[in-house]
């Protein structure tokens, strides 16, 4: 009974994949998100290519995507995820608030754009909005 309840609770959580090449930032972000019972972090990727692979494998509801990453940047990774995992919503989470970066992210299929200085409440709200919850 308890395991069924725990599985049901986990199924109701928004499944989030973090894609950021700054390991300490990604770990801190995971720790912050893990304190919210509505969110379950399903993985972390250190580059865009790994993010695409993990998204295919883990089928997240939301991907938090940095733009400037090695191997494949966040814009390319967003396009690939939207193509291969169409139900996943991508929120670009980056240090840049330059209008051209916002435009590029939207054109790639991003559902949201949050700068890293807006982490706490804005990010949780953006995740829940993107997941339709």
Report each predicted region and the residues it spans:
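Acidic catalytic/metal-coordinating carboxylates
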Residues: 47-50, 72-76
